[in-house]
């Protein structure tokens, strides 16, 4: 397998973007990624698009074709990737594999999603189907917050995690999201704000839940030979990728205090990259709900099982702590345009590893120059863990 590097990144403004079409939104990310990489559309041989809501949340049913043509990517081979909320990471892996296997020299992973063109109740119904539709949604009416409320209650019962612990995750992520110019939610909040917010699915409250978001992110990758040819100043190398899947039916899961797919994907990523959790300088984890971030700490080995709440309680996941997590605000504050999130995580990893965080107060200190992105699809139905190294 050939070495592959990230050479260019771009990210649109996240939020309610009814001012643009899906193609225009994608272009907001693609254009700066070209400029960052020092290439043009004609140089890209392969495009993998992560997008979930085609024909449901937004109007286009063939978004890879439509967005690529709008962005001038007329010579590239196209594919759309779907892995629920991990679709962006699936697209990144697919673009990486195209280069690593010798099928392309330059490829793009593009995430583009519009979730706010339809009303909230319809959107929530579609998201609620992100499991086993017949057994869980159709029969029991589980919404997506209700799925993660099951995990939150189980984690509390087994490990003593509290609602205040969950609130601390939200407070941290809003703190850093307020510093991020592309973030959807820029308001700083307190633990009391979280605890006083409306109950969505007990114990999860409004401020425990990520927003529904429109947004796009673009990642340009290149082979080692192309990196040398282009004389890229600061390539960020793909050190390892691990991936795994979980059972469709939640009743077949071993427990509700973590995601087995996250454990397996992280183990495979560490092995592929030849690093240990202690060598990770910072991480982006899938905090669709506050409990998801705490479980992620444990699942990917940042702490022992049952100690995730302690990690955030002690401030260890903030800048200056043991392992900074979600310094862009995470899904909770930056936003969660489902098919885009994985690529947006890679955008943040790349910016941090190049020491280019737009707001310097959220630039993480780097020792090993290694960052990790953990991206979950569904309730652990898919998981990708990507490790980048400068």
Where do the model's predicted regions map?
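Conserved active-site "lid/cap" helical segment
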Residues: 1-86, 155-162, 184-190, 203, ...
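Condensing-enzyme catalytic core mediating Claisen C-C bond formation in acyl metabolism
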Residues: 1-23, 135, 167-168, 199-264, ...
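Beta-strand segments within the central parallel beta-sheet cores of soluble alpha/beta enzyme folds
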Residues: 6, 41-51, 77-83, 107-112, ...
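Buried hydrophobic positions in well-ordered alpha/beta secondary-structure cores of metabolic enzymes
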Residues: 7, 33, 44-47, 88, ...
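Electropositive phosphate-/nucleotide-binding environments in soluble metabolic enzymes
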Residues: 20-27, 57-61, 89, 142-149, ...
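Short glycine/threonine-rich loop-to-helix capping motif typified by GTGT followed
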Residues: 54-62, 250-255, 287-310, 337-339, ...
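Conserved catalytic cysteine-centered active-site region
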Residues: 54-106, 114-147, 185-211, 244-246, ...
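Active-site-proximal alpha-helical scaffold in enzymes
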Residues: 82-113, 146-179, 219-225, 336-357
């Amino acid at each position: 397998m050939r070495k592959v590097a990230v050479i260019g990144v771009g990210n649109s403004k996240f939020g309610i973007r009814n001012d643009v079409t899906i193609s225009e939104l994608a272009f907001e990310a693609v254009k700066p990624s070209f400029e960052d990489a020092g290439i043009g559309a004609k140089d890209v041989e392969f495009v993998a698009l992560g997008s979930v809501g085609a024909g449901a949340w937004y109007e286009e049913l063939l978004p890879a074709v439509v967005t690529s043509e709008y962005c001038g990517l007329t010579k590239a081979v196209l594919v759309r990737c779907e892995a629920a909320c991990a679709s962006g990471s699936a697209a990144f892996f697919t673009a990486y594999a195209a280069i690593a296997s010798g099928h392309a020299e330059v490829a793009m992973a593009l995430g583009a999603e519009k979730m706010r063109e339809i009303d909230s109740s319809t959107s929530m119904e579609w998201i609620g189907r992100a499991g086993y539709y017949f057994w869980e949604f159709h029969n029991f009416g589980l919404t997506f917050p209700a799925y993660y409320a099951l995990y939150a209650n189980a984690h509390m019962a087994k490990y003593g995690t509290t609602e205040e612990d969950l609130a601390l995750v939200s407070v941290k992520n809003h703190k850093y999201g307020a510093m991020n110019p592309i973030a959807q939610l820029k308001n700083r909040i307190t633990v009391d704000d979280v605890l006083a917010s409306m109950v969505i699915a007990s114990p999860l409250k409004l401020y425990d839940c990520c927003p529904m978001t429109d947004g796009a992110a673009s990642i340009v990758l290149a082979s080692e030979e192309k990196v040398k040819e282009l004389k890229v100043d600061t390539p960020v190398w793909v050190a390892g990728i691990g991936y795994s899947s979980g059972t469709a039916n939640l009743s077949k899961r071993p427990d509700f205090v973590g995601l087995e797919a996250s454990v397996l994907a992280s183990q495979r990523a560490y092995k592929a990259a030849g690093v240990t959790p202690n060598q990770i300088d910072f991480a982006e984890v899938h905090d669709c709900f506050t409990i998801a971030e705490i479980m992620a700490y444990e699942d990917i080995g940042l702490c022992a099982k049952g100690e995730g709440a302690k990690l955030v309680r002690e401030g260890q996941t903030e800048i200056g702590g043991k392992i900074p997590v979600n310094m862009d605000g995470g899904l909770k504050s930056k936003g969660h345009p489902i098919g885009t999130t994985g690529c947006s995580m890679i955008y943040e990893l790349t910016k941090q590893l190049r020491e280019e965080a737009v707001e310097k107060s959220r630039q993480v200190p780097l020792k090993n120059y290694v960052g990790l992105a953990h991206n979950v699809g569904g309730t652990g139905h898919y998981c990708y863990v990507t490790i980048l190294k400068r």
